[in-house]
Amino acid sequence: MVGPSRLAGGGLLLLLLLALLPLALDGKPAPPPQALPKDPAAASAAERIMRALLPDSKSSRPATDRMVHPEHQAGGGDTRRLQEPAKKGLLISCFDRRIDRISHTSDMGCRHRKDPPRAPPAAPSAAPLAVTWLIRDLRADSKQSRAA
């Protein structure tokens, strides 16, 4: 058995609810809710509003368009000129071929890319060579003059 101290802590309330439960279930079911009297003017206004809010109704499309795209109502004009131009033919792969022409090349990857041939080194002109000899001779003369 359960001691009286355990029942005082909240078990007593549970026992009381369990004892009263059969009495509550013997009652009659709740009556159905009464329908509100309909006003024909209010009903037709509500129906018009609901018809206007349906997405499939043609009468709601102009109102929706004005809400979604307000710039067109204020003389927005054609928006195509604001879009970026198409970038046809600008896609170049890593080996300087158009992307739709990749299958027609023999080297299919970037690591096989060949750099353009370099120009052969130009022959040095006579002027820098003469200046180099002159500087070398001047240094040799200055070393000899210091040694003397």
UniProtKB/Swiss-Prot annotation:
Residues 63-83 have a biased composition (Basic and acidic residues). Keywords: Disulfide bond, Hypotensive agent, Secreted, Signal, Toxin, Vasoactive, Vasodilator. It is found in: Secreted. One of its GO terms (molecular function) is toxin activity. Residues 54-83, 105-127 are annotated as: Disordered. The keyword Coiled coil does not apply. The keyword Secreted applies. GO terms for biological process: regulation of blood pressure; vasodilation. One of its GO terms (cellular component) is extracellular region. Belongs to the natriuretic peptide family. This is Natriuretic peptide BF131.
